[in-house]
Amino acid sequence: MIVLDASAVIEWLLQTPTGTRVEERIVSAVPNLHTPHLLDIEVAQVLRRYVAAHIITARRGQEALQDLIDLPLTRYPHDLLLWRIWNLRNALTAYDAAYVALAEALGAPLITCDRKMAAASGHSALIQVV
């Protein structure tokens, strides 16, 4: 069982060198991958920004979005995590805290590319940076 955050998923979807490392880390866990619903919005926003900045084409953005929809992820609503997200407010943004809170609740490692999130204190999640 693994929790994925948006930074790891965007790299995986765009098949970057970092995305290859993400895939190597999670391949044995498929389809036991978990994330808060927030991931979909965060990934869509990054794809939108990359298209606007001409980092990827609109077509590639659409393909990545479809790949996201097709991923075998178990998604969790935020309401179950809100109090823990709030309690992490001094160490993490609410966005990052959603992933950390889910990892804590499931007792699963969190895979991320975000070193700042991984360095935060005040939680019991096992965070693995790719």
PLM feature spans:
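Short, structured loop/turn "capping" segments at alpha-beta junctions
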Residues: T20, T57-A58, T74-H78, Y95-D96
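Short active-site oxyanion
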Residues: V30-L33, L73, E104-P109
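Short, well-structured N-terminal submotif of metal-dependent ribonuclease cores
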Residues: M1-L38, Y50-R59, E63
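Acidic catalytic patch
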Residues: L39-D40, R60-N90
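Alpha-helix capping/helix-boundary segments
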Residues: A8-V9, L39, L81, Y99, ...
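Short beta-strand scaffold positions
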Residues: L4, T35, A94-A97, T112
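Acidic, PIN/NYN-like endoribonuclease modules and their adjacent C-terminal/linker elements
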Residues: M1, L88, V100-V130
